[in-house]
């Protein structure tokens, strides 16, 4: 099993130790060295032959029997699949054309490589072990080809010319002879009839039993790792180091990491393909027992396959010649690390070289889906080797709505162990396409007819099935590395729906499914001691209405290897190194120097006995030297190097021996002849200073600038070093070789470079921003650079309100405060932001020379004025965005003007001729009408008059609410207001409100129509019969003066009656008037209001109201006064006392019913006919008793008593019907019938005593001269006494009075008095 959290391999209790395992199992096409890979099985593509991973092997068509020969009883009911045909899914390039129930007549069909999906790399491998095998460091690998191994070893062997006496140690024991076994994997051909379900429901009812659908599954051979018989010298045993240390820096490696396309289908799949890791490792002789080096691999790599125990196959490195362990392996899978610890082998042998040839895996856990340019890397020691690959997982097997995929995810096999044969796990994706399936069933079967040695099994005693439901939309790992914590365990829901068959099969009934499921089958291997066991397990998904689809997996077995070898010698050697600190002692980090010649002389004979040239790492070896004293001389040192001090320290293996020294070989190698050399180094630099006077020369009072970055480059422009100046402005580059260098100074912030190479003293001038410095056997401290503080300038000016919108600042125009102004550099980056002050001024300070961008934010309620008006840039507007240039002085010319946008308000005053309150097309404007504009507080703002077309307009108005008042033009009357629903056509009346909101308001109209004029007048006539009525025979009176007064009593007109007595006042408006008739001389006012309004007399003063029509009813009549001549002489003394008592009771009952119907249509002309019939009956009874005694002499006394009772009952019924039709002319007929009955009884008793001498007088009241006319032109007399019906009562009363006093009345005298 595999712990996915820390990638630590976990083995089950009781697992056989790997050292007893003869075989190990690898995943198909993962390509691990010395493995046979596992494959995913699906149906083939016809008669095409699949290609092996490395080469095509002879196919063993071992399974040619028909499906019927291998069928066993299966109880699963899948009858619904019988009639279905399977077709190829064009989208599945890795799929096959023959699936499910389909049978063809093509005979045996081979499954192409594209049809085989291998298991995934879940960081576990499979090992097989025979329990009777003994542990042996020289493991027998029957899959290895010795000839190929040896040739590869030689290919990897370095050309060590000094080892001419090396003897190759060849394996001689029987175990090593077994290495000659072929490494080729046997190609297994699997017939599809064996893959077919033995359940009859999976066989097409229409198929011919002779037409077998056979598909061959081919397992390609795998390339085994090549053992390296690495040549080594045998050294004398050295004391082991007391403390183990990491010696990654003391090993060198030549490594290749190759992605192997095992099935050569141009697709890299972690489960099918693998990585080939080959490396030749050279161990420095300084390495001691207990020291270690590491191999680090990336997260995308794992070092074992399906079996956690198989990690030991990448294990200790051994000498293949004698089986001796060179380095032991320790795995840290959590950190992707292998630590190799050296044994004392390295103490006893020199020039140890090791070769590894591993097949390692791609980790599907970190590569869950197909992805391009996936990096894989392995670091051996300190050297990292990388490669990349485009990962392309095969698609799921799909047929119609059915889809499936599977892989072996863990396999541990113990071949030959009956008690613990091992286990394996297969992961199956059911319905990964998340289609809705009906009656879905999954059949899992550990059987294939082409694999007779299949050690898989499925039954309820050894098999454990887990079922997980996948959330909708969840992305499954295409490498089948499943994190079950993210899924839902539904195993318990399906326990009763799992049916085990007798043919190593199980069927899971999912019923109706619309989501994906993950099925994990965990089962045990069958016991086997076969030399070539295989594992095959199939999975088939069926559902109603869809063709079934199948997939499967297969595995084979083999091993990994590594190794090395050596030979005992005596030699002199060690190391030439660059002693960078010149202390004469080798230290960590100091590197070797190659191509130095080392010559060894026999010190006794001065004979040259050996010569070598140091390798690139500085090491050298002079072999085959017997015991004795030798002189070692070093020559041909690299140019420019000098020798470090010799014999420093107390460790002769680490010190320097100098150019020539004598050493002794005594029974062991002498590796102490070292030489330390160093390359003299020089300095380059000087000074960065502030050139305050800008003369380009360092003056005594000018100080350095700290913190300036200085960069050193080689002649090719490669950066070598970077430093910053110190507090004094000094800088220095140290440890430089002779050569030409480039020095670059970074301009410090706020400074400007001074002039370059002023004067003649190169140590005092400025070399500028970039200069070249030469080192030639001495320091160069002359490279200086001067800077002066960059002058700062200001930019800005003014934002103003351009009230007249001319784009120029006028003296009366004021600044706008609070306007945001932004300064940007040439790249559009914001440098500063400010706001204008109360006077509209703004300024950006501290600016260097350059081009700037200034942006003005338009203030609320304003609009930018025109740009660039006039020729004076100091007062014009630069707009809302402009460019300002600073060149050695301030720039105070950047202005921007804005004005408040104003709008217009107004429209139209028109003559509404039809008085409908709506502007019609033919109605024209009224000119000269005064219109007043006020603000909300009634303050008058402007006054205009309408033009000749009736138009008016108020301009330059701000947003706001205004009041508009229209003055009624003379002779006009305002029309109706807001008629209709068109605000632009109706009348807003005399006073209205107008709102301006960011636009003109031209909707405020007012309509008027011409005020009608009327006439007033009629007639003054001579009332000859004094009855107060105009008779046809009575004529008018001319030259009677008539005066007209208005309501205020002011005289507005005077006229005289014409020769016919007619008069008229014209051009009058509706209103109240008073008409005064001046009585003609010698005439008397006749009675008033005696009859109809147009025939009677209205009196001397008449109040009248004109309402929308003429009034020609104002008449007045006069009659001529009577005259009398009498001569009388009378002497009379008369005393008259008169007492009159009068009691009068009057009861009057009056009932009046009046029904009137009137329909009237009137335009402008009216003709009226009126007929009136009136019948009046009046009965009056009056009884009067009068007693009168009169004594007349000269004195007359009269007493009169009168009692009068009057009862009056009056009933009046009046029916009036009036119909009037009028268009432009109106005719009106009015018929009125009136019946009036009046009964009156009057009783009057009067007693009168009168004493009269000669004179008797009586006064009677006169009818008033002034009457009031109402608007109906009906005259009404001013009230006298009583009510309107008092006329009849008074008649009765006066009748009684006249009867009682008849003798006393003198008619002639009364007329005189009336006059």
Swiss-Prot record:
Residues 569-680, 681-791, 792-901, 902-1012, 1013-1123 form the CNA-B domain. Residues 1-35 form the signal peptide. Residues 1091-1101, 1118-1134, 1142-1164, 1172-1254 have a biased composition (Acidic residues). A combined vaccine containing IsdA, IsdB, SdrD and SdrE afforded significant protection in mice against a lethal challenge with S.aureus Newman or any of the clinical isolates NRS252, N315, NRS248, USA100 and USA400. The immune response elicited by the combined vaccine is greater than the one elicited by its individual components. Keywords: Calcium, Cell wall, Peptidoglycan-anchor, Repeat, Secreted, Signal. A motif (YSIRK-G/S signaling motif) lies at residues 23-34. InterPro entries: Adhesin_Fg-bd_dom_2 (IPR011266), Adhesion_dom_sf (IPR008966), Fibrogen-bd_dom1 (IPR011252), Ig-like_fold (IPR013783), LPXTG_anchor (IPR019931), SDr/BOS_complex (IPR051417), Sdr_B (IPR033764), SDR_Ig (IPR041171). Residues 130-145, 174-183 have a biased composition (Basic and acidic residues). Belongs to the serine-aspartate repeat-containing protein (SDr) family. Cell surface-associated calcium-binding protein which plays an important role in adhesion and pathogenesis. Mediates interactions with components of the extracellular matrix such as host DSG1 to promote bacterial adhesion to host cells. Contributes to the resistance to killing by innate immune components such as neutrophils present in blood and thus attenuates bacterial clearance. This is Serine-aspartate repeat-containing protein D. It comes from Staphylococcus aureus (strain Newman).
